[in-house]
């Protein structure tokens, strides 16, 4: 008998246990009935996993979770929801998120915020992969708060930086600037994290310029130089000095040259390339308005 056929037998057995509800209730076997059904659903789910029938495996784990909830173990229910989500993630994102949220509800009720944060971050990553940046931002914020409450500062900052990244893509520059400056300030006094400050300063200043706030960018750059003396000698700082001046002068050629020089040594990622193109477009608009 193949795995799928065996899985179907376990599903049928679980369904049969649940249909026998009234008889078991009369003799006090209700909780055991749900636990036994959950066990059968779990066996079916594992067989479906072996056959890579991900949706069917996810559905069986989800049914097991629902049985555990009605039975004696909310902990086992949460674990089954997580297993269901792992299967659904292969192609059914909405159901994966639903299951993760169900697991998180249990873990937060139990005060287990570290594991809640981990699964909330998974939800954010699923939304990110789907290109739903608004939902990703909201989910990363919840995860960041959970991590922060557990004093997992690095993990909290990783989530915040994702929010900053997507906020800038959505042209919510003030939010991005706020986060980059917040994370930079928190990183300055730690030898393991202060190296990242030049990147946060660069991104924050680029957001000022993308918002067509040259004066704000100038003031911010000076503030960053004062916050971290070593920033003055970095390529990031020299790039910002150069492109801010180019923006001041509405000089597209100088701007392009500054960016090209930086890119020849430190290749630009897609986010910076996108933001720099927006800044260049603001210079072009200013030049056209003068003409």
From Swiss-Prot:
It is found in: Cytoplasmic vesicle membrane. GO terms for biological process: intracellular protein transport; SNARE complex disassembly. GO terms for cellular component: cytoplasmic vesicle membrane; phagocytic vesicle; SNARE complex. One of its GO terms (molecular function) is syntaxin binding. Pfam families: SNAP (PF14938). Signal peptide: none annotated. Belongs to the SNAP family. Interacts with nsfA and probably SNARE proteins. May be required for vesicular transport between the endoplasmic reticulum and the Golgi apparatus. Involved in vesicle fusion with nsfA and probably SNARE proteins. This is Alpha-soluble NSF attachment protein.
